[in-house]
Amino acid sequence: MNAPHPASSALAAERPTLADLEARDAFAHRHIGPSADEQTAMLGTLGYTSRAALIDAVIPPAIRRQDGMPLGEFTQPLTEEAALAKLRGIAGQNRVVKSLIGQGYYGTHTPGVILRNILENPAWYTAYTPYQPEISQGRLEAMLNFQQMVIDLTAMDIANASMLDEATAAAEAMTLLQRIGKSKSTVFFVADDVLPQTLEVVRTRAEPIGVQVVTGPAADAAKHDAFGVLLQYPGANGALLGDLATYQALTDAVHAAGGLVVAAADLLALTLLAAPGEWGADVVIGNTQRFGVPFGFGGPHAGYMAVRDAFKRSMPGRLVGVTIDAQGNPAYRLALQTREQHIRREKATSNICTAQVLLGVMASMYAVYHGPQGLKRIAQRVHRLSATLAAGLRAIGYTLESDAFFDTLTVVTGPRTANLHIAAQAHGINLRQIDDARLGISLDETVTRADVVALWEVFAHAAHAAAPDFDQTEAGVADAYPASLVRQSAYLTHPVFNAHHSEHEMLRYLRSLADKDLALDRTMIPLGSCTMKLNATAEMLPVTWPEFSNIHPFAPADQTVGYREMIDQLEQMLCAATGYAAVSLQPNAGSQGEYAGLLIIHAYHASRGEAHRNVCLIPSSAHGTNPASAQMAGMQVVVVACDERGNVDLADLEKKAAEHSKNLAAIMITYPSTHGVFEEGVKRVCEIVHSHGGQVYVDGANMNAMVGTAAPGHFGGDVSHLNLHKTFCIPHGGGGPGVGPVAVGAHLAPFLPGRAASGEDASQNIGNVSASAFGSASILPISWMYIAMMGAAGLTAATETAILSANYVAKRLAPYYPVLYTGAHGLVAHECILDIRPLQKESGISNEDIAKRLMDFGFHAPTMSFPVPGTLMIEPTESEPKVELDRFIDAMIAIRGEVDKVISGEFDREDNPLKHAPHTAAVVMADDWSHKYTREQAAYPVASLRARKYWPPVGRADNVYGDRNLFCACVPMSEYAQD
């Protein structure tokens, strides 16, 4: 045998192994922005030789994780293709059938132009909440359309920009009426035909705040001296109570008794039936799911709330309003923000800080695309098929509970009920088994004539009768609701609902809105405490698979096997990441997860005979949701001081814990802290609270700094909520959806919500906090995909890179802006706070001026004035490549140069590029330019912008004008005539 040539041996030594080649296909390389060489350079800037050395310096040794995060079969990462294939196999265990179960969830056709250009479009789904209005005009307009749609269909005065779901909206309406009503009663009456899941969430919310929930026939609503009444319109079983006079008399009676009325209304029905605002409702709530948003096994969907004008300043949730910009042109913004938890804390109208913007945009665009006539046709067709189905069932010999309905029939089926239910499933149709003698059938826009005939055949076979002829039956049916209940008022008359009915028009309208906004598809969004990381396409793909999107939340268990497996695996993944023993995925938002966690703590104390424990210690630096959630959970908030370094003041904590020892329920801390540092004394904080009988709630908002490196369940936490829309890659959607799982130690596991749906003992659970057992189930595959593709080492690398990037930004900017808080060794966690107050004192330039000027550079602003007024908080995340980090740093340095020119007098203190930012194209191109700086300085402060320029569509929004002149509906087209 010939010996190998020396040159061949050398080549073989350089030849990569197959394992090397496969490793380079790892998803972590796609998710983590800085390359290995770039990370080395960044570490060099910080004075470290390795990422491990940096992490050792940042994270206190006492809490450093040593177990390597046991992810089981997901410890090793899957490639994108392998993860998709594995999840496809799991999804294939679900069975997609036609679900006519109803109960607030209906089949719907998502128009392709909306599916592709909103739900599947990163320009929409990667955007943040529009707190910076100048770069959010597109989605603000879309949400204003949503508000106008709800206002018109409900005939109310004002609507908010979506709620988490219908059940949450009902619970919020209850607390709203308690706040604003004049009644001293503690009774809230819920009609017995309200959706069961709504009633359960209302009960959960009522108990800790001392509200007594009473149920009974809607006709008895005025007999219970209730401060509020909740009616379903139409009822859960489909029935309408009577004619218009019946509804008016009912609301009049409630008002005369000192109460107020909430109507839970079906928006599609309101295209045909008199609106609740026309028969006396004070608040109208509901769900917009059937406006083009799939079942998704229960969510996410956009709930809604509309109120009378007198209640607008007490309404929870976000509200889009119209104001003017610096040039006097109309501009959209979030209005009345002083109601919200991030400002009013425990005095807020609600703890909600997540809406359902992406789903609300879809629903509003469904209305825009179909228009008033199109929606009415859909409703008329659904009703015609429902009336035809009813007539045929009567002809076969069945009795209906009500002859007045919109789309839902309750059929008296007697001893045939169970067999009929099974027979319908055998024909590919799910019905609702109400009890052992009745079946419910809810029709929707996906139902066809063939479906009606198939149902007749099932029912006829059971009755040993012949099915009727469709055409003959349909020809003889009349509308199945009272003539006086027919809607007479116009709706959706604004031009936006009457101009975009061709697909070309709609496509271009959606593109025009997206072009107005900054999202992650254009630029980094360095918002502190928000974790705006990559939402990878591979993670998003499964969301629209029919096996996930077309499953009804109340579908039989044998049709949801795949969902249960995926959910169980994700829960185990999250337990591994947090160090806790159990997780519930039910909460629809971080705020809801917080609330659930506090209810769990209360239930735990009560189970031990210590229900009197109601004091919640909260550091002064905490996020506003913390005190708002504690208040909602019936707890007394006691504030703990922070020291000059931003850490919890241990002496003050010991004092407050001892002072309230007998009644101490919990402490709520965020870790790393909201000041962006790993506090060295966190274990001592936990020990102090535990020694006084309290539980430790670790807010998981900053979990992106701990996955793989530290675990709250290991260093003393008893319960945490997570934000899957931060740490685990669910996109923010412009302000929702979100998922806020609650994770607990073993001793708290029996109290988790949603345990019954998982087949576990639910005797001690706190009750449901959202409408669906698994919350926003259809977006859970995003987090499953992320974890499966990253594996344990990849997740840890992501955390370490996030910390590296934050410290790199802080180090580079420190010579220009003071970094307010640092931990040991002068380092930060995954975010840093720049103190603008000294500069403002010297120059008059505020953090807001800098935030608005960043828009001229093509950047979204960092978080303003949280947790410290007059600051900017920056969180770059692990996904941003070094070139983007440097582009942002260069912009901030250039802005500091402009501030220096103000200080030196080269720029006027009032007439400078910062005070007038952002600059629109119209301003820069105007014939008149009277500023003391050049157009080029305004629009192109750095040369790179010439190749890549974003133009804000409006100038700086006037917040004061907007709140003083509150207008929260679509702007008349005459306002835009000048454009």
UniProtKB/Swiss-Prot annotation:
**Role summary:** The glycine cleavage system catalyzes the degradation of glycine. The P protein binds the alpha-amino group of glycine through its pyridoxal phosphate cofactor; CO(2) is released and the remaining methylamine moiety is then transferred to the lipoamide cofactor of the H protein.
List UniProt keywords, sorted A-Z. Answer: Oxidoreductase, Pyridoxal phosphate
Q: Which CDD domains match?
A: GDC-P
- Write out the GO MF terms: glycine binding; glycine dehydrogenase (decarboxylating) activity; pyridoxal phosphate binding
Name by which UniProt lists this protein:
Glycine dehydrogenase (decarboxylating)
Could you say which protein family the record assigns here?
Belongs to the GcvP family.
Q: Which domain of life is it from?
A: Bacteria
Q: Which organism is this protein's natural source? A: Ralstonia pickettii (strain 12J)
The record's EC number reads 1.4.4.2
The record's PANTHER family line, in alphabetical order, gives:
GLYCINE DEHYDROGENASE (DECARBOXYLATING), MITOCHONDRIAL (PTHR11773:SF1), GLYCINE DEHYDROGENASE, DECARBOXYLATING (PTHR11773)
Needed co-factor(s): pyridoxal 5'-phosphate
